[in-house]
Amino acid sequence: MWKWSVRRWAGARVNISKNRLSVINVGSRYLSTARSPLSKVRNIGIIAHIDAGKTTTTERMLYYAGISKHIGDVDTGDTITDFLEQERSRGITIQSAAISFPWRNTFAINLIDTPGHIDFTFEVIRALKVIDSCVVILDAVAGVEAQTEKVWKQSKSKPKICFINKMDRMGASFNHTVNDLINKFMRGTTTKPVLVNIPYYRKQPTSNDYVFQGVIDVVNGKRLTWNPENPDEIIVDELDGTSLEQCNRCRESMIETLTEYDEDLVQHFLEEAEGDYSKVSAQFLNASIRKLTMKNMIVPVLCGASFKNIGVQPLLDAIVNYLPSPIEAELPELNDKTVPMKYDPKVGCLVNNNKNLCIALAFKVITDPIRGKQIFIRIYSGTLNSGNTVYNSTTGEKFKLGKLLIPHAGTSQPVNILTAGQIGLLTGSTVENNISTGDTLITHSSKKDGLKSLNKKKELTLKINSIFIPPPVFGVSIEPRTLSNKKSMEEALNTLITEDPSLSISQNDETGQTVLNGMGELHLEIAKDRLVNDLKADVEFGQLMVSYKETINSETNIETYESDDGYRFSLSLLPNSDALPNCLAYPLGVNENFLIMEKNGNWDKEWKYQVSFESILNSIIASCIVGLQRGGKIANFPLYACSIKINSDWSVPPDIETPQEILKITRNLIFKALNDLKPEKYNLLEPIMNLDLTIPQSDVGTVLQDLTGARKAQILSIEDESSVSNSGASTCNSSENSNRIYIPSDAVTTIHATKDKKNTQETSSNVKKIIKAKVPLREITTYTNKLRSLSQGRGEFNIEYSDMEKVTNDRLQSILHDL
């Protein structure tokens, strides 16, 4: 048996020999991640369903990495990554938190812990934009849950590791959860799970119960157990008995899976290992797992119990061993597909073959009460230096950078440079009003003021494709308590939507009402709390309401403005479905609206105006957003899925100094085009939700009657709940895969056995059905109580946004009457 302390694996090198282990201290608590070579950097996101243990796992990672001196606890509200007051009081993650920390002395992990609640989907979307890979955390009791399915789809192209958490809980099943993983994500694909470690249960001397106490390391053939009295101690044992048998079978299954895709491993297995599974080296297995994980052919699976400090260090090892570095990940998506991109092993992503071209994406803005506005950025190419002159290719503005920081959740570490692959923070007065979420920043890697050295047409016009913002589905009216509070309310709202672009503001010109729109009830509840308690807005709120939209079903007239001093603009509005599919389009906020700019004669020539094209473009975009927010003729709801087309004959005076006049001209043209459109050319749209219901079979009839009748639902499918037996080992076979994957059986305790027997006896009368449907959001805002009544409290459901659909004539008047 070997026993050692692992309190500071990040600042220590652990050497294992046959008879001894030595720990060599190597340094500082904040080992700078800026010093790590690109090949040793990992940009990861932690994603999962709410309450699967994302933040708990992250806190253990920070403890074992040496970042924190004690283990943060969600329940007591002292976590590092959940540092907002609302997060600590509610015990949930509300916004994504970024933190950088070292591991194993040489690796740097940039981690983003994301929310699990569906209302904060945008936080996951923008995190996925800048990470290279994911750790998916699954609840061993609940299996694959609804939000896990959603984030898995959203992160489809990202390499992943799965960590099955809460293995210490009553009802936990490694077997069921792995099978659930296969059935929901891998059936019909070529992707397979590879069990890197499996649970180890120890039988209690005073009962027949088994307690989860560690993991069996399948790659190295060892048993790891954690001392419950000392979170810093891991005990390593040789395998015997059932543990050895399970490990051998898992190792054989692992090698069979890997050799299906990896010819190098096939050759090693046949020649060097002589066809003996036990002789395949751990080094070769790790290399094969890494190679195939990065190709999305396999998903390594590990397990543990983060709250009990079990399995976290092996998970950290898997992150650095199997997930890609920035020079092995996907290349960024640029607006100009003709610009060459490749990875250089020394400098990372190389754009336009220019080592001095630095490109970064601003993916998040926060307001710190002390430091002011801070912008999270991901460096994709080149080097960003403090004090550099930066060009915002999204807005056309130039400015000088202030301080650079590396984020540590609620704190940060000052640095002088940020290199390709890093996630960092920008602060200072110069960035406050010059950067928003989704902006692309460009600078020279080695010159403080080297923008003139970059190609004006090919490099300074580059943009990383914008972050998708889903449309809001709920709204709440907001007004100042007194007229003197109006300005502070507007400033607070502006701060709020700058930090969270999935919130939006709409105004009714007729009533003067201001509406704050968001992704769900909890989303708006948090926003209201922030407005009042953090931003000190003295306001009153109305009732929660569904966010309806309007759209047009035909093109407007072309409206033209021409002046003697050189301004000329012609534009029209049309439904998105009528827009040309390959035209150059710019997104307009959160409502699926677009600006189409046709090329004019000056487009490809030397730019002759004093203001940049980006400044002109952003003024037009701002006027378009205002014009579309004014709403349609049915009920003044904001317009949705519309394109504004600016004809190619547009021009501005050569001596134009500011784009303010352009904003006014285009806004008035939009108003005129919409005013001239007949009322019957407008349609009312409502949010439609995907509804997943799990109910007893005996209640299917009454629930279906309620859905199709009172709730106007469209039933998509009715299926038996997917269930997998937990008694005994199993093999699962994806329909596209020929080899079978061994999954060890779960240890059975006395309580489990009694529960299983009871469930078996009740099966005939308690079969669960899953109903999938589409239903208008308006009809299920109070569905929780209704379903509880219909199913005697045994039903549960999840909803997520599907799309906006035209309101049918038979429901239109009812909706308008209730407004």
From Swiss-Prot:
Alphabetical list of PROSITE patterns matching this protein: G_TR_1, G_TR_2
The organelle transit peptide extends over: 1-30
Residues of the tr-type G domain: 39-327
Q: Cross-referenced CDD domains, in alphabetical order?
A: EF-G, EFG_III, EFG_mtEFG_C, mtEFG2_II_like
Query: SMART domains per the record?
Result: EFG_C
Q: Which GO terms describe its biological process?
A: mitochondrial translation; ribosome disassembly
Q: Which InterPro entries match?
A: EFG2, EFG_II, EFG_III, EFG_III/V, EFG_V, EFG_V-like, EFTu-like_2, G_TR_CS
**Superkingdom:** Eukaryota
Q: Which GO terms describe its cellular component?
A: mitochondrion
Q: Where in the cell is it found?
A: Mitochondrion
Question: In which residues is GTP bound?
Answer: 48-55, 113-117, 165-168
Give GO MF terms, alphabetically. Answer: GTP binding; GTPase activity
Similarity comment text for this entry: Belongs to the TRAFAC class translation factor GTPase superfamily. Classic translation factor GTPase family. EF-G/EF-2 subfamily.
Q: What does this protein do?
A: Mitochondrial GTPase that mediates the disassembly of ribosomes from messenger RNA at the termination of mitochondrial protein biosynthesis. Not involved in the GTP-dependent ribosomal translocation step during translation elongation.
Official protein name in the record:
Ribosome-releasing factor 2, mitochondrial
Q: Which organism is it from?
A: Saccharomyces cerevisiae (strain YJM789) (Baker's yeast)
Q: Which gene encodes it?
A: MEF2
